[in-house]
Amino acid sequence: MAEEVPVINPEEWKPRTKVGQLVKEGKITSMKEIFEKNYPITEPEIVDVLLPKLKYEVMDIKIVQKQTDAGEISKYKVLIVMGNMDGYVSYGTGKAKQLRVAIQKAIKNAKMNIIPVRRGCGSWECTCGEAHSLPFKVYGKAGSVEVLLMPAPKGTGLVVGPALKTLLTYAGIKDAWSLTRGSTYTTENFIKAGYNALYNTYKFVTPVDWMRRK
């Protein structure tokens, strides 16, 4: 179930980095500028200011144990997916003794991992020209899991696994097919492989991009 991502009060934010200072001063006004100039997202508050209407969903909760001199220490490990359902998506993990704190850490981690997703109408079966699917095939890998995402005609829906469906929904993709290999039952690697595939939509340079740069 989607939850609103908590954000800080911009007036109380004291930037610790150059990029944060530029955002605070209003010299950077969008996430698009951040990625176009290859600036790193080193403070979660940057995302709070530039993408304030994010939502997240808890995908997995595990109890992990660590052996210490005092014995075994148990912690919650939380995996979340985050996005604005309009071209930006992320995932994050967090560990803590309390579940609430683990979720907070996962949200912070996800803000640092936010990426842009290029959408389009890349299926030869569809000529609507709307940004409802992917512009081309993209591949991603994490651990033993491999994911190939493919454009689908409008109205097809997301013909993918449940975890991948959530990730694509939060990215704002409505129609897609997928091929997967490996241990897809490991939710974290499955989502990470899908995330890596989506990131490749942005890294791939199309002829249209070359025209824009001239």
From Swiss-Prot:
One of its GO terms (molecular function) is structural constituent of ribosome. SUPFAM superfamilies: dsRNA-binding domain-like, Ribosomal protein S5 domain 2-like. The keyword Metal-binding does not apply. InterPro entries: Ribosomal_Su5_D2-typ_SF, Ribosomal_uS5, Ribosomal_uS5_arc, Ribosomal_uS5_C, Ribosomal_uS5_euk/arc, Ribosomal_uS5_N, Ribosomal_uS5_N_CS, Ribsml_uS5_D2-typ_fold_subgr. Residues 54-117 form the S5 DRBM domain. GO terms for biological process: translation. Keywords: Ribonucleoprotein, Ribosomal protein, RNA-binding, rRNA-binding. The N-terminal domain interacts with the head of the 30S subunit; the C-terminal domain interacts with the body and contacts protein S4. The interaction surface between S4 and S5 is involved in control of translational fidelity. With S4 and S12 plays an important role in translational accuracy. Belongs to the universal ribosomal protein uS5 family. Part of the 30S ribosomal subunit. Contacts protein S4. This is Small ribosomal subunit protein uS5.
